[in-house]
């Protein structure tokens, strides 16, 4: 009698996942497992960076802080900072209207500084021949009274005289020194003589690298903060053992304090309206802190710290599993003892939960799933290593801080913005292309592993079993559980079963030949009968036509 279909099928895992990925060839491919590599969340707070607090200037600008705007007294002495936070339009800037020369360059310098130590270089009390306390303005109020910047001194004439100033400071510190000074531009000649006595004045400043001569620009101007005059501030970095020399006969705003640069490092001036969140992070953006090991984010292009790379993408998902096409249950006519078993062509197996690839067998002892642990583990290791490699390579920590330009540098600013946008487009394209290509390769890798497992079984069974074309093999001999296990572990003994398989194969072939002979006789009979009937009809038609 004929052997009732003992079978073994090769298939792959399926589950209830609805995760979808894109590949080079397809979109929205449902897979069993996937890994998101794009961070899209933040905490909406300003945090410490690696345990170091930021310097949050609140309503003060950098200029207001450095010059000592009376409304910025909380920042007279500040500890080490990780980064500086300034609002887009801080209220407490230059209280006395004017300009801060090379302000953007100074901010760029601050992006490489983590700590200042404020030191007195020319005491206010040392100006015995000039009024050092009368230089105040209603534009810089403090407690309802006129005041002035805390770190500089506005020198006024004394006893209707303004003797020429000659003052020097030698930097005996081991650190660089940030020194600030300024010039007052009066509204008219009357104000000039009222404040400084001398109608024609100048300010000279010199170091080993600086040679500056300033003269006041007297002009009628619109009032700002109640003032028609203007002040212009300057700065320089004084190196150790270098001296700065001042000479002036009027309009001089002298330095009282300077900033010793005691610690340099990676910092930034970040524009943000957020409040301090009493938290810690490795990556800060103006929108909030990011705590993520993902290689990409789409939160904000400007960052400080160890951050993922910003891209414009909305979705970057790497597949780690297989195509998820669960086998659909459908009514089938029963075949053999255990019915038909679909293989990997018809869909994945949700019943196989302990591996990615494996077997389903059926024989007289029963049926069941078994994962191929070796191929599954190799695949898991391969995919995991690949994903980790991609993340490691792309997770080079990036820092992108904003750059500021003055009004004369708008064309440079526009060019810089176009270049940065171009770089972002390239990074985004590269990231998306990388994901598409790697997803395609991963799915092909899984398909190849299933095929390899199939070929492993096929090469063992040879002509002892029949390929059903759906990932399954039907044995020409009885295959009990021990036999099935030998197929799975690669120790199937082909010679042991070949004689019995050969007899059954010949018996099946004989049945096919006998059936084929019957079909051929019926076919010949049908052909002859049809031809004879057609000949009789033609002859009858001819006789009828002739008789007419």
Swiss-Prot record:
It comes from Influenza A virus (strain A/Chicken/Hong Kong/FY150/2001 H5N1 genotype D). It comes from the Viruses. Disulfide bonds join 9-472, 47-279, 60-72, 95-140, 283-307, 479-483. The chain crosses the membrane at residues 521-541. Residues 542-548 are cytoplasmic. The record marks 335-336 as: Cleavage. This is Hemagglutinin. Major glycoprotein, comprises over 80% of the envelope proteins present in virus particle. Binds to sialic acid-containing receptors on the cell surface, bringing about the attachment of the virus particle to the cell. This attachment induces virion internalization either through clathrin-dependent endocytosis or through clathrin- and caveolin-independent pathway. Plays a major role in the determination of host range restriction and virulence. Class I viral fusion protein. Responsible for penetration of the virus into the cell cytoplasm by mediating the fusion of the membrane of the endocytosed virus particle with the endosomal membrane.
């Amino acid at each position: 009698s004929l052997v009732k279909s003992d079978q073994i099928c090769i298939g792959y895992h399926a589950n209830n996942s609805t995760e979808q990925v894109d590949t080079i060839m397809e979109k929205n491919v449902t897979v069993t497992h996937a890994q998101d590599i794009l961070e899209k969340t933040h905490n909406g707070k300003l945090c410490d960076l690696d345990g170091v607090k930021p310097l949050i200037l609140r309503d003060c600008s950098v200029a207001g802080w450095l010059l000592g705007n009376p409304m910025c007294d909380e920042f007279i002495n500040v500890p080490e900072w990780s980064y500086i936070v300034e609002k887009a339009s801080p209220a407490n800037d230059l209280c006395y209207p004017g300009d801060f020369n090379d302000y953007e360059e100074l901010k760029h310098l601050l992006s490489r500084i983590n700590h200042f130590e404020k030191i007195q270089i020319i005491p206010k009390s040392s100006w015995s021949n000039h009024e050092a306390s009368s230089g105040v303005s209603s534009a810089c109020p403090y407690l309802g009274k006129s005041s002035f910047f805390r770190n500089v001194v506005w020198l006024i004439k004394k006893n209707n005289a303004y003797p020429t100033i000659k003052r020097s400071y030698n930097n005996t510190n081991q650190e660089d020194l940030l020194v600030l000074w300024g010039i007052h531009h009066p509204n008219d000649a009357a104000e000039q003589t009222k404040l400084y006595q001398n109608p024609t004045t100048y300010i000279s400043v010199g170091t080993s690298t600086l040679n500056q001569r300033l003269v006041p620009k007297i002009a009628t101007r619109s009032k700002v903060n109640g003032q028609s005059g203007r002040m212009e501030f300057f700065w320089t970095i004084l190196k150790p053992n270098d001296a700065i020399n001042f000479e002036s006969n009027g309009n001089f705003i002298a330095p009282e304090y300077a900033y010793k640069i005691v610690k340099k490092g990676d910092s930034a001036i970040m524009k943000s309206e957020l409040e301090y969140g009493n938290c810690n992070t490795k990556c800060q953006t103006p929108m909030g802190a990011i705590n993520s090991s993902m290689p990409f984010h789409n939160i904000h292009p400007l960052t400080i710290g160890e951050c993922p790379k910003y891209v414009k993408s909305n979705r970057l998902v790497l597949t780690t599993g297989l195509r998820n096409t669960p086998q659909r249950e459908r009514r089938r006519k029963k075949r053999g003892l255990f019915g038909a078993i679909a293989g990997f062509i018809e869909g994945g197996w949700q019943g196989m939960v302990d591996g990615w690839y494996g077997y389903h067998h059926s024989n007289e002892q029963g049926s069941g799933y078994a994962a191929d642990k070796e191929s599954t583990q190799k695949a898991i290791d391969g995919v995991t290593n690949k994903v980790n490699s991609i993340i490691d390579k792309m997770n080079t920590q990036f820092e992108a801080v904003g750059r500021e330009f003055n009004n004369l540098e708008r064309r440079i600013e526009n060019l810089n913005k176009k270049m940065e946008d171009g770089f972002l487009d390239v990074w985004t394209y590269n990231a998306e292309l990388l994901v598409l290509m790697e997803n395609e390769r991963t799915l092909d890798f899984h398909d190849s592993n299933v095929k390899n497992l199939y070929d492993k079984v096929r090469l063992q069974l040879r002509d002892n079993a029949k390929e059903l074309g759906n990932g399954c093999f039907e044995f020409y001999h009885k295959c009990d559980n021990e036999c099935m296990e030998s197929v799975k572990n690669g120790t199937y003994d082909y010679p042991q079963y070949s004689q019995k398989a050969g007899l059954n194969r010949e018996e099946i072939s004989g049945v096919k030949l006998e059936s084929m002979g019957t079909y051929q006789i019926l076919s010949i009979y049908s052909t002859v009968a049809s031809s004879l009937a057609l000949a009789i009809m033609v002859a009858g038609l001819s006789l009828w036509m002739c008789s007419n």
